[in-house]
């Protein structure tokens, strides 16, 4: 199949549509689709991927639009792994968040095709709370928090902070083995090294990350993208409710917070739209305070339409 043609229904009982037909043409790649646009064969490109983005932005006859994808980048932290008990410390998780340069991840490795994420509900959703705390990149503040927690640099001049018992502040970060996620993981590793935290990287195929690490809770930290249902209802219950922390459920961080779970439970059953929004707001406030995992970015979807197309 190389395309689909939709024609106007002349028997439609209301006003006749103004457009006589719409033609969808299929191409083997985004580059081929862009060439077709340049040749005047099509009036738009359904997806402007990163490889053709520079050319698309430079094309004067192509208007570029973006929208958020229901896909969120996170560093998941395993809060119930006895190998890394320090991840249970809220202030330490906050220090890790402060030490993350999320904008660099977006600019350097995603060509700007994402926006920073500050919580577990997509920006733009009716359930998103705009007033949620937005934690900046502040390495100095991160270091101050670590010092407050008793993590200091060793007297011999080492670069990794240790606690009062001399144990290093170190953990592993498992990540997908594709080029983009590998570069992101290396950038995160460098960010945290700058505040005295040692991160050992583990590169695996995404299927292995899901099945061998997340599902089995056999990890310390993981760089992931959480895919949400393509519906107007955000329902963060599967990823963050305490009942989903074990078995094959998806609360991979094993976050066990009863007040947050109660808000999610109530939001699932009430039909009062305003009440649901307030319940999700309260949930997001707790999430921002506790930071059971570290939100990074929301991917965006980019497409292009000929400037002559109206409406």
Enumerate the language-model features and the residues they cover.
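A ligand-binding cleft/hinge motif common to bilobed small-molecule-binding domains
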Residues: 48-59, 228-233
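Short, well-ordered beta-strand elements
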Residues: 3-5, 20-26, 44, 168-177, ...
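Short helices/loops that flank or line small-molecule/ion binding pockets
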Residues: 31-41, 58-59, 91, 186-195, ...
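Immediate post-signal peptide segment of exported/extracytoplasmic ligand-binding proteins
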Residues: 16-20, 90, 136-172
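Detector for C-terminal structural segments
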Residues: 66-68, 72-73, 99-133, 138-141, ...
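Ligand-site clamp/hinge motif
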Residues: 9-55, 189, 196-200
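Bilobed "Venus flytrap"/periplasmic-binding protein-like clamshell domains
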Residues: 1-13, 28, 103, 139-143, ...
């Amino acid at each position: 199949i190389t395309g689909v043609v939709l024609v106007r229904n002349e028997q439609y009982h209301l006003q006749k549509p103004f457009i006589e037909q719409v033609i969808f043409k299929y191409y083997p790649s985004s580059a081929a689709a862009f060439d077709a646009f340049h040749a005047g064969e099509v009036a738009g490109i359904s997806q402007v991927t990163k490889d053709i983005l520079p050319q698309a932005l430079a094309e004067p006859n192509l208007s570029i639009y973006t929208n958020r994808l229901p896909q969120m980048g996170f560093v998941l932290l395993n809060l119930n792994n006895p190998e890394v008990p320090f991840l249970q410390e809220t202030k330490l998780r906050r220090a890790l968040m402060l030490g993350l340069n999320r904008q660099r991840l977006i600019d350097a490795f995603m060509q700007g095709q994402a926006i920073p994420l500050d919580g577990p509900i997509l920006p733009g959703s009716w359930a998103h709370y705009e007033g949620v705390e937005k934690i900046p990149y502040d390495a100095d503040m991160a270091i101050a928090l670590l010092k407050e927690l008793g993590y200091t640099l060793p007297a011999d001049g080492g670069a990794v902070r240790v606690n009062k018992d001399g144990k290093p502040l170190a953990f592993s970060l498992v990540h997908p083995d594709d080029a983009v996620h590998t570069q992101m993981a290396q950038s995160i590793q460098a960010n945290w090294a700058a505040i005295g935290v040692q991160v050992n990287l583990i590169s695996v195929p995404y299927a292995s990350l899901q099945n061998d690490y997340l599902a089995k809770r056999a990890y310390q930290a993981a760089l992931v993208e959480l895919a949400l249902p393509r519906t107007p209802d955000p329902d963060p219950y599967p990823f963050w409710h305490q009942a989903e922390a074990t078995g094959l459920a998806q609360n991979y961080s094993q976050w066990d917070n009863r007040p947050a779970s109660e808000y999610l439970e109530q939001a699932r059953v009430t039909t009062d739209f305003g009440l649901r929004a307030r319940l999700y707001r309260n949930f997001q406030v707790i999430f921002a305070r506790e930071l059971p995992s570290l939100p990074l970015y929301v991917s965006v979807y980019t497409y292009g339409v000929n400037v002559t197309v109206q409406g």
